[in-house]
Amino acid sequence: MHLPGLIDIPLRFLLLVAGLLVPGSMALRALRLPWSLAASFLISSAMLYMTVLVFTWTGTTISVTNLAIALGVVALAGRVAPMRGLPPPLASSLSCFSGMEAWRPLYLAFWTIVVYRLVTQPLSGPDVSFRWSYLAEQMLKFGSLNFYPPRSGSDFTRYLWAESIPPGIASLYAWAYGCAGSKLALWTSPIVGLQLLSLHELIWRLAQRWGGELAARRAVLLAAACPLLTWAVLIGQETGMTALSVVGIVWCLQNARERNGRSWMILAGICCVAAASTREYGPIFAVVAIVCALVLRLPARHAGCLATVAIPFSLAWPARVWMLTGNPFFSLNVGGIFPTNAVFIEWSESFHQNSAKAFSTAADWFALDRYLVLWALPAVVGVGALLFLVLRKVKETRVATVFIVLTIALWYASVAHTAGGLFYSLRVLSPAYALLAVAAGYGLGFVNWSRNATGLISFAITLLLVEALPKTLVLPENPYRLPFTEWAQAGDRLGHVVRPSATKLENIISALPLGARRRILSDNGGLPRDLADSNIQIVPLWSPEVAFLFDKALKPQEIARRWKESHLSFIVISKASPTRDFIETHAQWHTAFFTVVTVLETDSVLILQAAASPDLGPKT
């Protein structure tokens, strides 16, 4: 049955939002915990991820219908659970709006910019479309994750990148696309918007617990004045959910001695699962949370509840990846301990060679300082405030400090593996930015020794937020280097370049004489999605199907024979990548059995044609 758009779209939107909030709301009821928008969203997100894991392990079809049934069962179970006494209510989840007092117009201006970017620039991260979003589309298309992480040649034609990022964010996007019946990126904006709103709620709640409403107000304003934090959420990758989950863990641990302490620890465990769903290193947050619970000398039953919830589902995905690939961190070479996709590892190392040299010179450290001062000044203030609080042995900051240090360590380890460079790597620090905003909001309260000091602090925060608004609008661009007339579209400048280029490339590739099999070899992550309607199969450079091309142990004649049998001829290379040099130095086709010619070269793409000699001779 087809409903009119005016009815159909709102109903689909309501279903989407209901799946993101209702299961979590009912779970809070069953746990006898007060309702919170952030907690409801975190629980629902974790439940969706766990549902996808269960479906994957059991072979159940991943579809919007089955996901809705599973979420409905969770919601129903929470609703019928016996209720023994009402939990003490929390302040409104929208206190970050209602409690802003004179700052409310400025805070609303911040959210106006956020909503504008969510509507006009959804999923603006440079690789979201062919990783997180595309994985969501593919899991719905095939009804499973059997192809992920990709291992065989056929797997790599379904998902190009050789990685094993947990499908937490992809599960959320699959829910959005399934509810919408559309792959339009705009349908993911409610998810991203809820991440940021929930993050601000938890920043408010944590700072309020530490230092009252004034500290909460300052902390949220400082978070809004940190463009890098907002950008880390808006790009639609994993860093928004990581920040939300980590702040949620800290909040729950600090509530563990309250009434229903075990329920708070169960909620902390669910936050750990949400954190583990974001990235390969995610399970470390569960381990550190359990250690914190033990160091804080929380009751053994409380720590047991945390571990019972957090550990199994945090480790479920890496365990599956390990079973399938022999390496729990499939895209990483962990000291040669685990097997890897050798071609992808060598290719990515050449891609990351500049990032691997980060911090090798004073200029790198100066660039880091400049980036943080320009785009995350409240976090820099937060570092000073945190040091002050730690030296004063303020106990509220202990757990937050541990997770800030952990986040910085994870970021430092990730820089060498970030193709986007130092600035792009700073999105990984999103949990630290959020917690440092709390530390700054609380720490500033210690200098409130006069009315003049209070006024100066208020003026400084106002100035920070006003100055940050243009940056929030245009990041990753610099508003000081752009004409005002370009600000509105600057945040998606890469998209404005990539989309027309992708359309042009699609037309070029479609015109190539590809033969009956219609296959090309490429390193371009966006091509499988861009060419999905053209019936052209993309074989990635690192697919096991073409591993022979880089095998020095094979004889040239055998390599040529296999190339001809592969029905591949054209190679499409992104000039922004190191693939051209990589092929020159690694591909074993510089022999008399191959003829390699350049078919076309543009500003962004190189197209080669490799033909095996028709006279291959006998197989050797």
Go through each PLM region and give its residues.
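Membrane-embedded, hydrophobic transmembrane alpha-helices
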Residues: M1-L94, I559-A560
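Signature aromatic-anchored transmembrane alpha helix within multi-pass, membrane-resident enzymes
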Residues: E101-Y107, E213-A219, S263-C272, A286-I290, ...
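Transmembrane alpha-helical segments
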Residues: W111-V115, C226, R279-P283, G443, ...
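Hydrophobic, aromatic-rich transmembrane alpha-helices
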Residues: V22, L196-A207, L294, I311, ...
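Membrane-interface helix-loop-helix junctions at transmembrane boundaries of multi-pass membrane enzymes
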Residues: S93-E101, Q208-A216, R259-S263, L296-L306, ...
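Transmembrane alpha-helix segments characteristic
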Residues: W111, R217-A225, I270-C272, V288, ...
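Membrane-lumen/periplasm interface segments of specific transmembrane helices
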Residues: Q121, V295, H302-V381, K471
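Short periplasmic/luminal acceptor-recognition loop of GT-C membrane glycosyltransferases, typified by
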Residues: H496-S543, S569-A576
